[in-house]
Swiss-Prot record:
InterPro entries, per database record: Glutathione_peroxidase (IPR000889), GPX_AS (IPR029759), GPX_CS (IPR029760), Thioredoxin-like_sf (IPR036249)
Protein name: Phospholipid hydroperoxide glutathione peroxidase
Domain of life: Eukaryota
Organism (species): Macaca fuscata fuscata (Japanese macaque)
Known catalytic reactions: a hydroperoxy polyunsaturated fatty acid + 2 glutathione = a hydroxy polyunsaturated fatty acid + glutathione disulfide + H2O; 2 glutathione + H2O2 = glutathione disulfide + 2 H2O; tert-butyl hydroperoxide + 2 glutathione = tert-butanol + glutathione disulfide + H2O; cumene hydroperoxide + 2 glutathione = 2-phenylpropan-2-ol + glutathione disulfide + H2O
């Protein structure tokens, strides 16, 4: 029996356990591979740029753009500028942007979360910034592991994130509907947004 099927079979029992014994629920399914059981982005959590844990279920009903960011990349200015523009024009329509700093590509995000937050403020960022993470390898954040194996989240020449500013479009149900490579500027996503409002 594969892990995905096992998770689907056990999920109702785990949910009942969580309802009956909330203190125990966090320890019942805490293996490194829990992310494989997820059916949507809404089943994950991540620390925001200030270190507070955020349940991504808060994005249920919103169309989301999830991206890895870096402050010292050659693509930083165009990506931050266009992400800020998209947020300004589409936030009222229900679009949310989730930016995850990452230092795995050319060590182009070396600063602390505090420094990254200051940098983003220089672009007048109003979208959600998260704490620095890894997006590839064993230490990758579970959300990123999950997005990369989704049918519409797979990459070209393998599923690994290739560089800064890889973007995922997530529908209102928390499912990956498209992946955009690092060379694709954020405004490319604009043409796809109306399909998911």
């Amino acid at each position: 029996m594969n892990l995905g099927r096992l998770c689907r079979l056990l999920k109702p029992a785990l949910l009942c356990g969580a309802l009956a014994a909330p203190g125990l629920a966090g320890t019942m399914c805490a293996s490194r591979d829990d992310w494989r059981c997820a059916r949507s982005m809404h089943e994950f959590s991540a620390k925001d740029i200030d270190g507070h844990m955020v349940n991504l279920d808060k994005y249920r009903g919103f169309v989301c753009i999830v991206t890895n960011v870096a402050s010292q990349u050659g693509k930083t200015e165009v990506n931050y500028t266009q992400l800020v523009d998209l947020h300004a024009r589409y936030a009222e329509c229900g679009v949310r942007i989730l930016a995850f700093p990452c230092n795995q590509f050319g060590k182009q995000e070396p600063g602390s979360n505090e420094k990254i937050k200051e940098f983003a403020a220089g672009y007048n960022v109003k979208f959600d910034m998260f704490s620095k993470i890894c997006v590839n390898g064993d230490d990758a954040h579970p959300l990123w592991k999950w997005m990369k194996i989704q049918p519409k989240g797979k990459g070209i020449l393998g599923n690994a994130i290739k560089w800064n500013f890889t973007k995922f479009l997530i529908d209102k149900n928390g499912c990956v509907v498209k992946r955009y490579g690092p060379m694709e500027e954020p405004l490319v996503i604009e043409k796809d947004l109306p399909h998911y409002f």
